Amino acid sequence: MKNVAVIGAGTMGNGIAHTFAQSGFRVQLIDVSENALKKGLETITKNLDRMVSKETITEAQKKETLSNITTFTNITEGVEYASLVVEAATENIDLKLKIFKQLDEACPEGIILATNTSSISITQIASVTSRPDHVIGMHFMNPVPIMKLVEIIRGYNTSDEVTKTIMDLSKTLGKIPVEVNDYPGFVANRILMPMLNESIETLYNGVAGVFEIDTVMKLGMAHPMGPLQLADFIGLDVCLSILNVMYEGFKNPKYAPCPLLVNMVCAGKLGIKSGEGFYDYSESRKAEKIAKQFQ
C-alpha cells in the first residue's frame, strides 16, 4: 500500500495528505475546488517550512514530501491507483453518503474506503456501498501532522482484516491508533463536545466572560487552551454539526447545542477560519483579543 487518495483539501484533508506524504506514501489529494487545492498545498508547505526552521526535518525531506503529493479535481481520476481512500470532507452526512457512492463506483473491489468523520455512523456511511466490510473510520486529530491519536472505528460489517490493516498502517504513520465502537461522537467528541457546549452555555447564561471561562480551565484544569479558544480552533460550525449528530443519535437533551452556538454559526462567526468567534482573529491567529460581542 503506497498510494493513498485523500478526499478534501481543507484543514483535516491537507493535514492527512501531509502526514501520509511525509511518511513516504504517494498521495492523490482530491477536491472539487482548484482554489481549495491551492490553499491546501500552501498550508502543507507552510507547515513543512515551520518544521525545517525547527530542524525537525531537512529541506530535502520537505521537497520529497511535497513531491509525493499530486492534486486532482476529479474523483475517478484521483483514486485510479489508490490502495486506500481517506475521505475528509465537511462533517455533513448527505455529502459523505454522496462521496462514498462515487468512491464505491470508482474504486476496484478490495480497496479500503476510510472516513475521517468525527461523529457520523460508519455503518450508515458503509450502507451506501457494495463493500461495507471494507469501510472503516479513521478519525485523525487536528493538527494532524502533530497529534498522535487516531480513533479507529469499525462499522457493523467492517472485517477484522481491514481493521488490522488500518491499525498497523496508523502505526507506520507514527500515530497511536485506538479502536472504538460505532456510536455517535465515538470517544473523543462524545466527551469533548459536551464540555465545549457547556462552556458556551456558561457564557450564554452570564456566569462568566470569555477570558474568565478559559482562564479557569487553563489554570485550574491544566488544559493547554481554554474551551472557548478550542471551539474557535476546531470551528464553531464543526462543533455544531457534531453536537447535532449526537443529539439526533441519542435523543438526549444533554447534547442539544447551546442557542448561542447556533446563532454564531448562523451569523458566520465560526472561529479562526472566519476571523472571529469568541475571539477576534482579524490581526492574528492567536486568541489574544476577545471578540467585540463579548467584551
Which residue ranges define each predicted feature?
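Hydrophobic/aromatic beta-strand patches that form the interior of the parallel beta-sheet core
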Residues: 28, 70-72, 86, 136, ...
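NAD(P)+-binding Rossmann beta1-loop-alpha1 motif at the extreme N-terminus of oxidoreductases
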Residues: 1-50, 54, 106
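Rossmann-fold dinucleotide-binding core
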Residues: 112-182, 186-190
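Acidic/polar active-site rim loop that often engages polyanionic ligands
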Residues: 25, 143-152, 223-225, 244
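NAD(P)-dependent Rossmann-like dehydrogenase/reductase catalytic/cofactor-binding core
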Residues: 2, 23, 164, 171-182, ...
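Helix N-cap / loop-to-helix initiation motif
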Residues: 33, 58, 159, 208-212
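Rossmann-like NAD(P)-binding element
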Residues: 36, 56-112, 120
